[in-house]
């Protein structure tokens, strides 16, 4: 149990050496911890911070009540070589972070190339950035500069001030079978059309986005900033608006006046083979996201998982 901590609760730091180097920092497990009230002296502290390490497992932790990011894994900016790879950030319960103190944060944050890294089974909610900064950067899952070769699957992110999922720029990421819902600006955002999508090997694919449930309420954007067809591979996602039904909006740039309806986005080739239907959550308005067995999302290929697996192992902490 970590409670009322001045800075990081858990801090892992190695050097950016070759993965075969005998001094590489690797094979560490951070699991089944309760982490709360971190960063009480250094407000920008992180609950679990991993720098230059591989094969680290961060799982079954409950992390809450911090002023900045809960889990952060990097640390190379852009597409340069990074020893950080094959990390597992799984089945964590993360909530009530940011709290309006700082900006540019995520429940889970990654930086740089990370082949083999998986973000899975996490529940993230109530991430709030500093309103004096325009609420900038209250993200659920935040893949920052150069984040690449990362799989994001079976996560539930909701009630985030900015976006449930945010990709600054990166390549060859897979985002599948997640629930991104009821967040402030949009549910999913990529900034890939800033001209920094292409790594040195000439690749152009920023992201595969499929089999996700994307739920808005009252016209907030489902997806934003997706004008780069070459980098954007979206298909077979489930879209719905809690208040407006099939009246769903997509932003094709950073400006609100570039918002278009989902039907027009389909014509432009930005949205492919969607299921536009109520996913039939048990009570989404009250944040109960259990799916009805007759859900059209399941019929469309979405695979439910047990949300109760997130957080510390019951009865042990």
Language model features: what each stretch is:
Residues 1-7, 20-39, 47, 54-68, ...:
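Right-handed parallel beta-helix
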Residues 6-12, 39-46, 67-73, 82, ...:
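Short glycine/acidic-rich loop motifs that flank beta-strands on beta-rich extracellular proteins
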Residues 11, 57, 72, 107-109, ...:
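Structured core elements
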Residues 15-17:
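Asp-box/WD-like beta-propeller blade repeats and closely related beta-sheet repeat scaffolds
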Residues 51, 56, 313-317:
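Amphipathic alpha-helical surface "interface" segments used
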Residues 109, 139, 153-156, 166, ...:
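Generic hydrophobic alpha-helical scaffold/packing signal
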Residues 197-317:
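Acidic, glycine- and Ser/Thr-rich low-complexity intrinsically disordered tracts
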